[in-house]
Design a protein with these regions (language model features):
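A conserved structural/catalytic subdomain of Rossmann-like adenosyl-cofactor enzymes
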Residues: 3-179
């Protein structure tokens, strides 16, 4: 059951920042398949992977005009075979604006690579039909057995996103028809 409702509808937000639980194995897929809140508009994710259930809930919670989100996910949401159709539909609706690949070991007790997916319900005209992919896996410092992003790394990522253009070996703007 959604935590934020406006009467009988999902509450809508201008900005959603999320770090949902990764790849939940046990979840109520059957209930989501028949979701009365309209959160299954891309389809129903496979039983062992609830990531796209969270993704659809977040997108459904974004305000139609001003809604934006940034979601931290395991890198696997970008390429796992069993979620191909969900990804395809997500790309087709053209709300994904940016995908930032992050290096391993950035999170306590998690060695896996992660990504940040930024979506906008109203993309700038120059971004429509496009997604920028930023490979920030090399933008990680390590000290005292901890991995982290330094301010210079963060600024490089922000600059690449704001400029929305190719940067050799770091950022690539892709047409959604090529994804």
């Amino acid at each position: 059951h959604p935590a934020f409702l406006d009467g009988s509808h999902l509450r809508k937000f201008d900005i959603v920042l999320a770090n949902p639980p990764y790849s939940i194995k046990e979840w109520n897929r059957e209930k989501f398949m028949n979701d009365k809140w309209g959160r299954n508009f891309l389809g129903t994710p496979p039983q062992g992977r609830a990531d796209y259930a969270f993704f659809q809930h977040i997108i459904a919670s974004m305000d139609r005009n001003t809604g934006r989100c940034a979601i931290l996910f395991p890198h696997g949401v970008l390429f796992r075979d069993e979620e191909y159709e969900l990804r395809k539909k997500l790309v087709e609706i053209d709300i994904v604006d940016c995908v930032i690949g992050l290096g391993p070991n950035l999170f306590f007790n998690a060695s896996m690579e992660a990504c940040i997916i930024i979506c906008k319900n109203r993309k700038e005209d120059s971004h429509k039909g496009k997604v920028i992919f930023i490979d920030a896996k090399g933008e990680v410092s390590r000290k005292n057995a901890e991995s982290y992003l330094e301010n210079t790394h963060i600024q490089k990522i922000i600059s690449a996103y704001e400029n929305f253009e190719d940067i050799e070996y770091f950022a690539k703007v892709a047409d959604i028809n090529d994804i």
